[in-house]
Amino acid sequence: MPTVRIIILSYKRPDNVLQIVKAFEGHYPITIINNNPNDNVRLPPIDPKSGKQYKTIDIVNNKLNLRCMDRWVRCFQYDEDFKLILDDDILPSKTLVNKMLNLDQPIVGIYGKSGVSQANSYLELKDYWCVDADVDFLVGSVILVKQNVLNLIKEKIINIGYPERGDDILVSYWIKKALRINTLKTVSGKILNLPEGDVGLNKNPEHFLMRWNVVEKFKNLTW
């Protein structure tokens, strides 16, 4: 059986993180990356309801907000065959995770975009959310990736630093280029949307423009 580690990117949603931990702790080891330097993530040593100890969790409290790219950088610290990358506003079912594993793809997600070659802006791209499809790139949320595939693009991930937006776009295109494939896959499955609050990256009015700027670099073959 392949081994899996969950990487949760956390920013000001501690209740969501605890809900994800309770769903998966004991099934997979978990790393929580906390990008809120003003409030460390802490988990009780024992869940008061179940009496279960949290034994397989690493908590990384960053002293700076290293944004989303840090979740990919941290993957290289762990030996598991697969990394399941989760945002802190979504909880996939275990059945969905198993489905993603059984597909045995280099990288697979639940959310993707297509139509890059015809689009002139990010909002013109076609959405694929929790459906079985071939897409141009994957979008955050829930992504399962093979560690040996990430190893192929390790230098690019490390050298890019911590860009404000588009880590998922970068990784998607780097993997496509490394493996010489044209599309990536999204899958259907059951998920639970958790409260977003007022801290989502898409609250920034420049969010979609910044993501489109990343797409355009690949569209114009400058990266």
Feature annotation, model-predicted:
Residues 8-26:
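Short, well-formed alpha-helical segments that are part of the catalytic scaffolds
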Residues 2-8, 29-33:
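Hydrophobic targeting segments
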Residues 21-60:
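Acidic donor-binding segment of Leloir-type glycosyltransferases
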Residues 2-4, 13-16, 152-223:
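C-terminal catalytic/acceptor-binding lobe
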Residues 80-91:
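Short beta-strand-to-loop acidic/aromatic patch adjacent to the donor-nucleotide binding site
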Residues 62-70, 164-165:
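A short, glycine-/small-residue-rich helix N-cap motif at loop->alpha-helix starts
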Residues 91-160:
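Conserved catalytic core of nucleotide-sugar-dependent glycosyltransferases
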